[in-house]
Each structure stands twice: as C-alpha cells, then as structure tokens.
C-alpha cells in the first residue's frame, strides 16, 4: 500500500487518503467529526498515526497542517446578512420543489407545469427546461457531489434522468403504478431510489436504465427516502407510521422501525450512519440505533405535527420543524433540547443546516424564511418578500447563498 495524496473534506471535517493497493487507486476517509477550534491537534495526529498505517512519521507535519486548516474553517465566524439577489418567476403553475447542486452554481425547480427548470445561480438565467413528463414534476434532485445529472419524479408514475449540462433525457424509468413523490441518488451516483404512492420504493440503475430492485412491504405511500453515507443502506418512511431499513444491493429488509403513532413525514441517517431520525405527525421525533433498529430516544416538546427533521453535517445536532410554528435543536448524544427557534407565525414545513452547522434556515407558511443560530436559538434574520407560503429552502455548500421556493410561484435567491 502506498499513499498517493491527501484530500481535505471541510464539512463534515475529515481527511481523505488516496492510496495505491495492488496497482489499484483507492480512497479511505478519516472522519474528524468531533474536531473543534479548541481540539489539541497533536493529540489527534497521534491518534490517527496509531490507527492508520498509511500515515508514517514522515507525514506527521503534513497531517497536522491539514487538521489546522480544518480547524480554521470550523472556527470561522459568519455574521453575514443575506440580501435578496433575484426573484425568479420560475413557472406559470405552482412550484413543487427547489434543489441546489453541491457548489451552488446552479439549482433546479420542479412544477405543476410538468417541467423541471435548471437555473444559473449567479445570473438568475434559465439554462434548460427539462420537458417530457405528462404530469406534475414533484421530486427533483442533483446527483451531488458530482452535479452532472438530474433526476425528476412525476405524478405520471415515471422518473427521468437528465444531463445537467445539456438538458438531454438519458432514461425514463417506468414501473411504478402510482405517483412518485420522493427520490434520491445513492452517494456513488450509480442508483436512483424512488418512493411512490403505490407503497413501494424502486431502485434504478443509472448506467443501464433498468429497474434494479423493488422494495415492497409498506402498507401506505412512501414519502421519504435516505441513503447512508456508504450507500449500502436505504431507509423508507411511510404513511403507515413505520420506517424500513433496507440492505442494498440485496434489497433485504433489515429492520422495521415501529413506534410512531402517526404518518412519517421525514427520515434521515446521520453522517456516520449510527443513528436514524424520524419525524411524525404524532408530534414527536424519534432517534433509532441503525444497527439494531431499537428506538433510543423520543424527542418531545412540539404541540403539533413534526413536518421535517434533519441532522447537521457531523450528525451531532438534530433539528425539527413543526406545524406548531416552532423549530427545535437537540443534541444527538444527550438527546436534550438545546434551543427553541420561536418567531414564525405559521407552520414550518422545511428546516436545513448550512454545511458548517452554525446556521439554520426555515421555511414557513407565514410567507417568511428565517435564519437562526442553532446553538442559541436566536433569530438572526427574517427573509421577507414572498406573497404566499414558503415550502422549500436550501443552502449551498459554502453557506453563502439561500434559495426559497413559494406557493406565489417565485423562487428567490438570497446572498
């Protein structure tokens, strides 16, 4: 084994080792999820050296410099105010979803007008209109981190794969017998998973355009999908009050997470895939041990349905958004509520962390989006201007641009 080079991963903090083994180029990651501005770097370097044979004494200084760079990035204080940069009257009919590519250089909008549009973030110009679906385009996603492909899921029961660069349609995936309402790429960008009102999830092979798997077992529609970081597990959240954990590529159901008393609204893995967070209409969020499928905590406090849940990029914080107009931040390890985000005058349907984990953005039916400090719960800014409820919001990877999507048929870029 011979170490070729180091790659730095800022969020969540880590060092990727590129090495040669038997003539093949391979990579492995050293996760530094606990790294903070006060961490003793020499101690960390020592621990890495003990655990990782590729890091020899001659590399010590290099590794130390990399960790110092990561530390500097984590410690950067960001007091930026966001300003409205562009209002895009994206579609004639209502929007369904908005999503960024990883760098944030472009984003996509889905709509009831049966199209998905690709936009240049810097100029606000439309790059492509992806046409071909025969009904509402509901679920949309880039294959991040690559960002060269887009998947669209439609009420016409099909999923389509497109080139982000040219707008060309590569494949139309047919097989679902009802509307597709969620979809996700696996991290390797070799598979797309789709969830449908027909109670099944399907996996599609990006290369061949063929169906790879059907995951059956839920008793109601599947409305949430999440791959783990390595891509060998997929979770499906359903209106049947349960979440299933599937092994990929075998398609075997490993666990069914039973305990919620209402429909599931969202289900997510944390970064190291040790935990699964589930949000439900039963007003609670639950944390589950992903290895044994046992519930390890029920996060209570909301007075109404929990509509969204998300982890920060390291997996140390869990944030929930509720129909009660508040959001909450919990510690994933202590399971204690760290902050209550209060100020919205309507339900919060979407909540996102920036990659750095020091900001949260929320989307609400009160026509505003708000920016928060997740550690103090302080509202730092109210993004006003939409004239109808906001159902979608997203940060780009750098955290310096936000997009919001509203029922007023506009998409706003804030930077």
Curated annotation (Swiss-Prot):
Keyword Manganese assigned: no
Gene Ontology cellular component list: ciliary basal body; cilium; cytoplasm; motile cilium
CDD domains: WD40
UniProt entry keywords in alphabetical sequence: Cell projection, Cilium, Cytoplasm, Cytoskeleton, Flagellum, Repeat, WD repeat
Single GO biological process annotation from the record: outer dynein arm assembly
Subcellular location as annotated: Cytoplasm, Cytoskeleton, Flagellum basal body; Cytoplasm, Cytoskeleton, Flagellum axoneme
Mapped WD repeat ranges: 90-129, 132-174, 175-214, 217-256, 259-298, 301-340, 343-384, 386-415
Membership in a protein family: Belongs to the WD repeat WDR69 family.
Function: Required for axonemal dynein assembly and ciliary motility in ciliated organs, including Kupffer's vesicle, during embryogenesis. Facilitates the onset of robust cilia motility during development.
Protein name per its UniProtKB record: Dynein assembly factor with WD repeat domains 1
Organism: Xenopus laevis
Designated gene of the protein: daw1
């Amino acid at each position: 084994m011979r170490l070729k080079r180091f790659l730095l991963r800022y969020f969540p903090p880590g060092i990727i080792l590129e090495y040669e083994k038997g003539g093949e180029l391979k990579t492995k990651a050293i996760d530094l999820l606990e790294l903070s501005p006060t961490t003793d770097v020499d101690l960390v370097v020592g621990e890495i050296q003990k655990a990782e044979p590729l890091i020899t004494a001659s590399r010590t200084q290099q590794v130390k410099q990399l960790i110092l760079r990561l530390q500097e990035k984590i410690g950067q204080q960001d007091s930026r105010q966001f300003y409205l940069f562009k209002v895009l009257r994206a579609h004639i009919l209502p929007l369904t979803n908005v999503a960024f590519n990883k760098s944030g250089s472009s984003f996509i909008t889905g709509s009831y007008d049966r199209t998905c549009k690709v936009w240049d973030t810097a100029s606000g110009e439309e790059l492509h209109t992806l046409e071909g679906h025969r009904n509402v385009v509901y679920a949309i996603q880039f294959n991040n981190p690559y960002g060269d492909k887009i998947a669209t899921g439609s009420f016409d029961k099909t999923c389509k794969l497109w080139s982000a660069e040219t707008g060309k349609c590569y494949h139309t995936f047919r097989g679902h017998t009802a509307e597709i309402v969620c979809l996700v790429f696996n991290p390797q960008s070799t598979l797309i998973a789709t969830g449908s009102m027909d109670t099944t999830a399907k996996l599609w092979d990006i290369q061949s355009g063929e169906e790879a798997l059907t995951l059956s077992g839920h008793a109601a529609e599947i409305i949430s999908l999440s791959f783990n970081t390595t891509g060998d597990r997929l979770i499906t959240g359903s209106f049947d009050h349960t979440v299933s954990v599937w092994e990929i590529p075998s398609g075997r159901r490993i666990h069914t997470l039973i305990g919620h008393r209402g429909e599931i609204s969202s289900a997510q893995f944390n970064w190291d895939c040790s935990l699964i967070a589930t949000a439900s209409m039963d007003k609670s969020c639950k944390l589950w041990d992903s290895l044994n499928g046992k519930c390890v905590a029920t996060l209570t406090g909301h007075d109404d349905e929990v509509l969204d849940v998300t982890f920060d990029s390291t997996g140390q914080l869990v944030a929930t958004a509720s129909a009660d107009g508040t959001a909450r931040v919990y510690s994933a390890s202590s399971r204690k509520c760290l902050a209550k985000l209060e100020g919205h005058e309507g339900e919060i349907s979407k909540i996102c962390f920036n990659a750095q984990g020091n900001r949260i953005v929320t989307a609400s039916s009160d026509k505003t989006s708000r920016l928060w400090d997740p550690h103090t719960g302080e509202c730092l800014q109210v993004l006003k201007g939409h004239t109808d409820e906001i159902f979608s919001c997203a940060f780009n990877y750098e955290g310096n641009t936000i997009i919001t999507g509203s029922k007023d048929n506009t998409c706003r870029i804030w930077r």
